[in-house]
Amino acid sequence: MAKTRLYLVRHGKTMFNTIGRAQGWSDTPLTAEGERGIRELGIGLRESGLPFIKAFSSDSGRTIQTMGIILEELGLTSQIPYRYDKRIREWCFGSFDGAYGGELFHGVIPRVLKTDNYKELSWPDLANGLVEVDTAGWAEPWDKLSGRILEGFEAIAREVESSGGGNALVVSHSMTIGTLAHLVDENITKNPNVDNGSVTVLEYENG
């Protein structure tokens, strides 16, 4: 059986990314710059010669758009199985979804949680802090958030493994990929910088 590898791609740069708004469950399309970056990624993956047997993304428009571009550049549109999984969506920022990120991450969160830098917070503290400041009641507490992210990626990995293993493309989101990295390796305690169009490779084995 081939090794099971997930190639985790953060979606391309969007309108909200460009103007600095918090983009969780809210959604905006890729900009022209974002599309170009993902096309370059697709070309790079094609030139690498890596074979991909399945594709997955969250159900957000920006990840679906990103995957469409990558598959087009790989010549795999409609050629390999592709499905959405809402469990690998971005974090929900509740009443701050769509607000300016600076207001949330450099203003409200540091003030409420009494820290100078939100990136120094642990993942659980940041998640539970969002719940505390969310007036809409939509943000997910850490246990629920981490549970659905781990469940989603494990289901994807098991699906690939049960097909005999191989490489799968997975398009997701910055904080979701960072959360998964922490859940896989607890030494990754802080928010890593996951750039638009970056690739993180995760190897899965033994169920």
Predicted regions, residues:
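Active-site glycine-centered loops adjacent to acidic/histidine catalytic or metal-binding residues
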Residues: 11, 87, 173
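Extended, basic/helix-rich recognition subdomains
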Residues: 145, 153-154, 165-187
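Active-site-proximal alpha-helix that buttresses catalytic centers in soluble enzyme cores
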Residues: 2-78
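Active-site catalytic pocket residues across diverse enzymes, especially alpha/beta-hydrolases
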Residues: 70-74, 160, 184-188
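Short glycine-rich phosphate-binding loop at a beta-alpha junction
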Residues: 51-59, 81-83, 164-171
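Domain-level recognition of soluble alpha/beta enzyme cores
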Residues: 185-207
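Phosphate-handling substructures
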Residues: 73-148
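Generic structural signal for well-ordered alpha-helical scaffold segments
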Residues: 39-46, 71, 146, 150-161
